[in-house]
Amino acid sequence: MPEQPLKPLDLLTGLRTLEVEFIVIGGYCLAAHGYVRGTKDVDIVPEPEQANLQRLLAALGTLQAEPLALGDFDAGELLELNLENLRLGGNWLLRTRFGRLDVMQYVDGLESYEQLRAGAVARDLPGLRYPLLFAGYDDLIALKQAAGRPRDLEDIAELERRRQA
């Protein structure tokens, strides 16, 4: 499947329709804290229990998700997207019919899903029947500091500037 334009609401609806539990992190999460900027993907941290991973796998099927080969890897070298491999943890960079989805089960700066869940904020988005959970402000800052990329550091500065305004 060729790369599709990002349609985040359709992507997130596809996950929530099958009752997948997850928390949005990354660039799309910035909007939950008053800062909107462009992003090429949606990053989520799924709740790691097997039943949720089964729902996630079913949702990924409806989204026509397939692993995205990056760098020196080609498609034949990637793990198959199945429950056994999802349960191994790790991160999945996926191409879907609604754009790119990064399923992050290991994230620098994050101790556990439970920690992230404890600080998460719920937001209602237009067109969605369910509120979505987004990383809380302090967790988002910590995740971006741990990533340390120039874009993340710019995001931190902008979030802090807006918080002080």
Can you annotate each of these PLM segments?
Residues M1-A165:
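Compositionally biased terminal segments of proteins
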